[in-house]
């Protein structure tokens, strides 16, 4: 397994829909193993293939549900269903804050549906589905968003959208080709401290 560099916000691979996986699952095993390893070393709860520069509809996750139980898995060609997504300003108390390995070290309140279900193939090529509420639902929406070419900062509203744009510009994350490598570069989220 190899830890791969994580692509930062300005790269086009993050802003275009990924390609549906059509190759045999056996040809994806190294990629999926690398995705799990990269996510783990980055202390992430999810990672989409395009976040490591690969335009394929695959994401991995290791995320807690509302009771704190960890759920780990992989979805290939996922389909997302959700409850209604709120159109109001998200809470400013930290409960709606979301971060992203491709927007390193930053977090912004993000409105998400409270329930989500994902259906797709697992890393063995078997069809499966999982549903969750709260943080797990947020994780599923975030990762499928990546595969659809949507970074979570694209979904922000009001002052959070304006602040995210300023932050992205101030960090120079509008250009393609920028990356950070977990375990090599300083952890932008402060997990090393």
Swiss-Prot record:
GO terms for biological process: co-translational protein modification; translation. GO terms for molecular function: metal ion binding; peptide deformylase activity. Its EC number is 3.5.1.88. The keyword Protease does not apply. Pfam families: Pep_deformylase. Fe cation binds at residues 100, 142, 146. InterPro entries: Peptide_deformylase, Peptide_deformylase_sf. The active site is at residue 143. CDD domains: Pep_deformylase. Its cofactor is Fe(2+). Keywords: Hydrolase, Iron, Metal-binding, Protein biosynthesis. Binds 1 Fe(2+) ion. It catalyses: N-terminal N-formyl-L-methionyl-[peptide] + H2O = N-terminal L-methionyl-[peptide] + formate. Removes the formyl group from the N-terminal Met of newly synthesized proteins. Requires at least a dipeptide for an efficient rate of reaction. N-terminal L-methionine is a prerequisite for activity but the enzyme has broad specificity at other positions. Belongs to the polypeptide deformylase family. This is Peptide deformylase 2. It comes from Corynebacterium efficiens (strain DSM 44549 / YS-314 / AJ 12310 / JCM 11189 / NBRC 100395).
């Amino acid at each position: 397994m190899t830890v791969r560099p994580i692509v930062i916000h300005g790269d086009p691979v993050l802003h275009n829909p990924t390609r549906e996986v059509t190759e045999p699952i056996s040809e994806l095993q190294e990629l999926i193993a690398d995705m799990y390893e990269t996510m783990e070393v980055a202390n992430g709860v999810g990672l989409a293939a395009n976040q490591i520069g690969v335009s394929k509809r695959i994401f991995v996750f290791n995320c807690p549900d509302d009771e704190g139980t960890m759920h780990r898995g992989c979805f290939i060609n996922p389909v997302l269903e959700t409850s209604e997504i709120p159109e109001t300003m998200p809470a400013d108390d930290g409960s709606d804050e979301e971060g992203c390995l491709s927007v390193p070290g930053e977090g912004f309140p993000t409105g998400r549906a409270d329930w989500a279900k994902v259906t797709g193939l697992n890393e063995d090529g078997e069809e499966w589905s999982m549903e969750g509420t709260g943080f797990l639902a947020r994780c599923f929406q975030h990762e499928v968003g990546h595969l659809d070419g949507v970074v979570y900062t694209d979904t922000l509203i009001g002052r959070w959208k304006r602040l995210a744009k300023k932050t992205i510009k101030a960090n120079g994350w509008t250009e393609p080709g920028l990356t950070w490598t977990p375990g090599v570069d300083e952890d932008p989220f402060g997990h090393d401290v």
